[in-house]
């Protein structure tokens, strides 16, 4: 869980550790996740820019939704450009180009690279990190952001100036995307944004971040899976069907659950065996409330817990 603060001084001050007076008796640190108010200022300043206007609905409380442009490249393999540019690597790895301006199908088992409409001209002290939107994860579309000179997926260094690209790989369902489809979001950070376990415990005491049980805090907040239900007929999750058909990612609430998902029912042992390579949606046991002063994100992969990704 990360600290989120909101003074305009985020963009101007030279010290991440500086503090400023807010309300009486309150100090405001310049380290943290930048909120929507500051993202708007960055857009006005040209530090975030786009092929077209950035709409208000793209700006979330602590992130910015990013949009696909009109072209997709099917590529032989995913890559990081390291010291070079993404465009240079594309000349070696692109198989063919697809016009997605009016919609196109991205097939399962294939890897695509799409330039994004948004681009950055970041101040030196502002970094960015990208992750899939929750709606993207729920249909098992794997995405990773890259930029020129990047050595890591989903991370943009402070001071970066240039375009952004999104790697897309549908895992379970073939999907329809088009120019303007929003699959991932970007958070902007300054300084140290991670809350310590001590800070998390204090936050739970004050704001009750887990409101239906004990908060298991150790190197972050642990989240468990709920496999208990009221009756044996109760559903505890869903398993995705293979070969179920196309999903248009710009048409939410269009599809019937039964066409794409098989229910997972509770059993006597309150446990299930996950089939390798299959995709499941399971609910957490914990109910979480994130205070307005903070933002939270899940660790996508932790080998000490299991060899699987979570969204």
Question: Which residues make up each language-model segment?
Answer:
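DUTPase catalytic domain/fold
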Residues: 2-311
């Amino acid at each position: 869980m990360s600290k989120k603060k909101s003074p305009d001084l985020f963009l101007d001050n030279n010290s991440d550790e500086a503090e400023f007076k807010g309300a009486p008796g309150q100090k405001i640190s310049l380290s943290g996740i930048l909120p929507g108010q500051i993202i708007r200022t960055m857009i006005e300043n040209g530090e975030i820019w786009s092929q077209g206007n950035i709409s208000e609905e793209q700006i979330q409380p602590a992130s910015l939704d990013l949009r696909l442009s009109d072209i997709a490249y099917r590529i032989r393999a995913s890559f990081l450009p390291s010291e070079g540019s993404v465009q240079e690597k594309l000349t070696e790895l692109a198989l063919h180009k697809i016009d997605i301006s009016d919609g196109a199908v991205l097939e399962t088992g294939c890897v695509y690279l799409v330039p994004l409409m948004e681009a950055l001209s970041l101040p030196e002290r502002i970094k960015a990190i990208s992750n899939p939107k929750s709606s993207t994860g729920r249909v098992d579309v794997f995405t990773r952001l890259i930029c020129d000179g990047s050595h890591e997926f989903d991370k943009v260094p402070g001071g970066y100036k240039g375009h952004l690209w999104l790697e897309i790989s549908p895992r379970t369902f073939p999907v329809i995307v088009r120019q303007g489809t929003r699959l991932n979001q970007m958070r902007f950070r300054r300084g140290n944004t991670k809350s310590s376990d001590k800070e998390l415990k204090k936050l739970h005491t004050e704001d009750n971040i887990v409101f239906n049980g004990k908060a298991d805090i150790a190197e972050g907040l642990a989240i468990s899976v709920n496999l208990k239900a009221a009756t044996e007929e109760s559903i505890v999750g869903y398993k995705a069907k293979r070969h179920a058909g196309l999903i248009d990612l710009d048409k939410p609430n269009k599809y019937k659950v039964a066409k794409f998902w098989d229910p997972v029912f509770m059993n006597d042992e309150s446990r299930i065996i996950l089939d390798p390579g299959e995709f499941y949606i399971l609910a957490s046991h914990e109910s979480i409330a994130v205070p307005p002063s903070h933002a939270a994100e899940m660790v996508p992969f932790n080998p000490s817990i299991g060899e699987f990704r979570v969204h």
